[in-house]
Amino acid sequence: MRRILNVLSSRAQRRLERIRTAPIRIHHKFRPSTQVSNGEFTWKYSTPTRETWVRAKTMFTKEPKTIDWLNTLPSKGTLWDIGASVGCFSLYAAKSRNAEVVSFEPMASTYSVLEENIHLNNLGSYIFP
């Protein structure tokens, strides 16, 4: 009997979690996003504005020297990204270099997109905004 209650309890907990997270899942489903790849890795970016879309799509061409510099970061190194914006370079370092990243972004609206991008790429254990 106890086992049945545990299964029911577990099932009820999963159902409640789905109900609780429904607004977030709906939000992500309808919020515009784009994917960027360098051939080895792929990143997903929330693109609520044209500027965020352009920033994501040009991350490898707009600042190639920054990408080159990030490639010199030791594997599992630490990066402090000051003025992280929507997190293009934070996400790049975390995924491609397996780096721990501390990201600073002072603008609240941009910070919320940064947090969403961290979530979309499952990098919450690597990037700390």
Region annotations inferred by a language model:
Residues 129:
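Donor nucleotide-sugar binding/catalytic pocket of nucleotide-sugar-dependent glycosyltransferases
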Residues 1-122, 126:
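S-adenosyl-L-methionine
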